[in-house]
Each structure stands twice: as structure tokens, then as C-alpha cells.
Amino acid sequence: MKIAVLLSGGVDSSYSAYSLKEQGHELVGIYLKLHASEKKHDLYIKNAQKACEFLGIPLEVLDFQKDFKSAVYDEFISAYEEGQTPNPCALCNPLMKFGLALDHALKLGCEKIATGHYARVKEIDKVSYIQEALDKTKDQSYFLYALEHEVIAKLVFPLGDLLKKDIKPLALNAMPFLGTLETYKESQEICFVEKSYIDTLKKHVEVEKEGVVKNLQGEIIGTHKGYMQYTIGKRKGFSVKGALEPHFVVGIDAKKNELIVGKKEDLATHSLKAKNKSLTKDFKNGEYSIKARYRSVPTKAFVSLRDEAIEVEFEEPFYGVAKGQALVVYKDDILLGGGVIV
């Protein structure tokens, strides 16, 4: 089978390509230029070229920087301006990697596209679903909630049945040169963030703009450094007069540049809504497991569709829901879709 492999210049994607080559597949390597850091691209393209030369496969470099900027990067900035906590990876995957890159791979005559994601594909009644990775500590299915069944059917995740701790030894044994590759340390798993998301925002908007902190009764009780520097649940970086116990951000008013803070129990919610839904065609209202942020523990909840929105009711109090994050719905370890929390 002819398969396109997205190569990032790192160990995981390189070993994914090696695994598929060992299985006898015909491969085409693809490197995506998404963010605007040419210094990073130069290094990672060089790394990807080394992997392709070792495997004896061609490498194509696709420049999607303009598309990425308008569809992902600019949306990231806008979301923070609106007081939300965006999830750019969940937006990038369906539009870039499994959108534009997949389309290109199909034009090359490839039947499928592979990546180093920690996830799996499972066919149920001739329909393809995303399944959680074997390694639950590294599972990335959360970021794949917006993919259509027809797209999922064209995906391959060679690392999905492996444990992260085993991959580097396997990769170095198979491809010794991987141990000599230079890389940049990524922050928060967001490819275009150098040190922190705040540094990225500072390039485009006024981040350090002092404002007031209010309690749930609307009383001014302190100050903060600028609302974009905070997310729901944060407990540091702002002042609260006479506070004897920790206070947490429970709300953000972007228009007024105000934070609303409260105690930990004030972070609790029993329901939430999500828009821009992407759910399986056969989805039925009922009890499922949900995640409202990456790396959170799956939580039981009743999920229903109403007026094109996803509505969730929790059995137990759920803490720290942030607008802009992905709400993802699972049945056991099978991904059924999700939406953006509002």
C-alpha cells in the first residue's frame, strides 16, 4: 500500500515511518511548514531528510503557512482576546494535517496518511472510529474529535499500540542516527509557541494591561496584570486584598478587562454546552465519558443534542471548565466526537 507519512523531524514520526517500511509499504515522506519559524523548519526538514535517506523514501515539503495563519494561528489570538482558552491542535488536525495534507497525499496516489499521533483507528460495523491509544498517559485522541468517518478510514497511527517509554529504545536501535538529532524543546505541545503562549500573544496584542479583580458579588477586591494572562482555574498572578485562603479565576470579562475569582468550590459546574459539534452520525443521547480538557480524567455525564449544540449534565461537580477548550465524548475508549465549549 502507498502511504504518506507526516514527518515532524522527531523520533516518533521517524519511527512511525520505519515501522510502515518494515511492513512492506511504499512510503512518501511529507513535512508541513505551518508556523512562521523558518529556523525551526530548517532544522526539522534536515532531520526529516535524514530519516527519509535512511529509509530510502522521497520527502516533500508542503508550505501551508498562509492557510495555517488564517485558520489556526489568527483564531488562537482572537480566542484569547475574547477571554477564551483555545485548543489550536484540535483545529489544526482536521484542517491542515488531515485536510490539506491528506488531499495532497491522495493526489500523489497514496491510499492513506500516517502520523506519529498516539491514537488508534478501529472499524466497527464497517465504520472507522478513533480509538484511544494503548498508552493512556500519552493518548492524543482528544485532539482528533473533529474528524469525519471518511477521513478516519484513511489514517494510520503506527504508535497507537505501543507505550511511549518503549518507542525511543526501539527507534534508536532501528535508526541509530536519531540519537544525534537536534531538536527544539516545545512548550505546551503547541508548535508555534516558543516559551509561553503569553510571549506569542505579546507579538500581536496588548497583554500587560492592569485591571480589577472582582468577587462573585461584583465587589472589587484586587488587581491583575491583564486578563489574557489567565485561564479558568488559575490561582496565581493576581492580588486579593486580605485573602486568607486561595482564590481561583472562575470567570473572565474580556470587554472590561476584569477577572472574577472565587473559592475552589466556585469552579464547580453541573452542566456545560459546546458548539461547532462534530459527532458520529449514529449518536444518540445518553450517558458517556467526556473530557473537557486535555489530560483530564474521563468523567461520566449525560450528553444530549439540542439546537445544534451539545449539552452535558454531570453526575458529580466538574471543576475548571474553560470556554474555547474542546469537549470530547467517548463511549468506553471509542471517540464519538465533540465540540468547542461556550
UniProtKB/Swiss-Prot annotation:
Its main location: cytoplasm. The active site is at C92, C191. InterPro entries: MnmA-like (IPR004506), MnmA-like_C (IPR046885), MnmA-like_central (IPR046884), MnmA-like_central_sf (IPR023382), Rossmann-like_a/b/a_fold (IPR014729). Keywords: ATP-binding, Cytoplasm, Disulfide bond, Nucleotide-binding, RNA-binding, Transferase, tRNA processing, tRNA-binding. Residues 138-140, 293-294 are annotated as: Interaction with tRNA. Its EC number is 2.8.1.13. ATP binds at L6, L7, S8, G9, G10, V11, D12, S13, L32, G116. The record marks H117, Q325 as: Interaction with tRNA. The keyword NADP does not apply. Gene3D superfamilies: Adenine nucleotide alpha hydrolases-like domains, HUPs, Translation factors. It comes from the Bacteria. The keyword Iron does not apply. It is an enzyme of class 2 (transferase). One of its GO terms (cellular component) is cytoplasm. GO terms for molecular function: ATP binding; tRNA binding; tRNA-uridine 2-sulfurtransferase activity. One of its GO terms (biological process) is tRNA wobble position uridine thiolation. Belongs to the MnmA/TRMU family. PANTHER family: MITOCHONDRIAL TRNA-SPECIFIC 2-THIOURIDYLASE 1, TRNA 5-METHYLAMINOMETHYL-2-THIOURIDYLATE -METHYLTRANSFERASE. This is tRNA-specific 2-thiouridylase MnmA. The gene is mnmA.
